[in-house]
Design a protein with these regions (language model features):
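Short, mixed charged/polar active-site loops
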Residues: 43-46, 227
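Conserved ATP-binding subdomain of kinase catalytic cores across diverse folds
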Residues: 21-24, 28-38, 45-47, 52-160, ...
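Active-site activation/catalytic loop segments of kinase-like enzymes and analogous catalytic loops
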Residues: 237, 241-285, 301-320
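Long, compositionally biased intrinsically disordered regions
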Residues: 343-346
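All-alpha amphipathic helical-bundle segments outside canonical DNA-binding/catalytic cores
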Residues: 287-299
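ATP-dependent phospho-/nucleotidyl transfer catalytic cores
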Residues: 22-26, 50, 58-61, 112-124, ...
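Juxta-kinase regulatory segment immediately upstream of eukaryotic protein kinase catalytic domains
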Residues: 1-22
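Catalytic activation segment of kinase domains across protein kinase-like and atypical kinase folds
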Residues: 201, 215-254
Length: 360
């Protein structure tokens, strides 16, 4: 691997003498390495070198074009803000295609990350980071960006796929999941609200991150201020509620998304409030009334959509999501359905919190 990484470093014209690398274990899609070099002045510097998974991302050049457009727009608009910097090859490309390998290199940013937290300061700063990310891109020409994963948050199509999985019952699991099917089918129109409003033009298209887990924000190690939003592979046109709803779905559940303790699943309103405060602080005045009015409901939409996807995969024999045991996807689906029920019970409170945060 050393020789391969040396070759990549040379192609991206990185300064200094190659010292070695560390494999970065966080992240399950791309292979990531922290490469260390010694500069002419004797100091050491680090870079992140990634081998992009071209099975997961079938249009990696389009993906990198999206990232280039977004990072350059942020850099031009807010030069004082930290942004991801991707290095260029001699022919000014931000990627290197070497046989079947698709490489890219970015600066390493010393920082802290969090997989989960209930700290309101960190949550508020995470919300602020994702809200600011969207705010910085409100005036970008969205038509320049490609849809790297077509229909990623098209909830109607996700339901269509579940309908097919139910008809096929490919591995004979249908008899186990009738209560889950009944709930999701009853919730179909409510779950598809964002998709339907987007298709009708009632919600504007935005540049969205589409993977708004809290661990995709880098934080200052001393102050816990947010530094930069990372993992831009899924940046593409979408709806504002996609990012807000998925962030809340992931961060504001009392338990992990694959916990079997369904009685403990629920929306943590303290976490929800902290994240909403940060998100709306940076974005509230730029939102349309429809966006604001559907922000709380977006959490239900994104949670139900994922429940549909988990159940779909379970009925097809666990072909998409990585599982650790035979019923893993069913447990995930039941967990997300329990979270949907909790959100339904607290939707009036969630709406009130959103509108209160928007007024500050």
């Amino acid at each position: 691997m050393d020789e391969q990484l040396k070759k990549v470093c040379q192609a991206f014209r990185l300064p200094g003498t190659y010292l070695g690398y560390e494999a970065i274990q966080v992240g399950i899609v791309n292979q990531t390495y922290k490469v260390n070099v010694r500069l002419e002045d004797g100091k050491e510097k680090s870079f992140l070198v990634q081998n992009v998974n071209t099975y997961a991302f079938r249009n990696p050049i389009g993906l990198m074009n999206n990232i280039d457009l977004v990072t350059e727009h942020i850099r031009q608009k807010c030069p004082e803000k930290r942004s991801l910097h991707f290095h260029h090859t001699e022919d000014r490309k931000t990627y290197l295609l070497d046989g079947k390998d698709f490489w890219r290199v970015m600066n390493y940013i010393p920082s802290a990350t969090y997989s989960a937290t209930t700290d309101p300061v960190i949550l508020r700063n995470a919300g602020r980071a994702f809200g600011e990310f969207q705010a910085q891109l409100l005036d970008i020409d969205i038509d320049q960006l490609v849809e790297t994963i077509p229909n990623f948050h098209n909830t109607r199509k996700r339901y269509d796929s579940l309908d097919e999985a139910i008809r096929l019952d490919a591995v004979g699991r249908l008899k186990e999941v009738q209560p889950e099917i009944d709930y999701l089918m009853k919730s179909r129109d409510a779950a598809c609200l964002l998709t339907d409003m987007g298709n009708a033009g009632s919600l504007p298209r935005r540049v969205t991150h589409n993977d708004t887990k809290i661990n995709n924000v880098l934080f200052d190690r001393d102050t816990n201020d947010s530094l930069v939003v990372i993992d831009l592979d899924t940046v593409m046109p979408g709806l504002m509620g996609h990012d807000f709803g998925d962030a809340v779905r992931f961060a504001a559940n009392f338990v992990a998304e694959d916990s079997k303790e369904y009685d403990k699943v629920g929306i943590d309103l303290a976490v929800f409030t902290a994240f909403a405060q940060g998100f709306l602080e940076k974005l509230g005045t730029a939102m349309t009334q429809n966006e604001l009015d559907t922000l709380a409901q977006s959490c239900f939409c994104l949670t139900a959509e994922l429940a549909v996807r988990f159940l779909d995969d379970y009925l097809r024999g666990d072909l998409y999501f990585k599982t650790s045991y035979p019923a893993h996807n069913l447990v995930r689906a039941r967990n997300q359905i329990a979270l949907c029920r909790s959100m339904e019970a607290h939707m009036d409170e969630m709406n009130a919190i959103v509108h209160r945060c928007a007024e500050v």
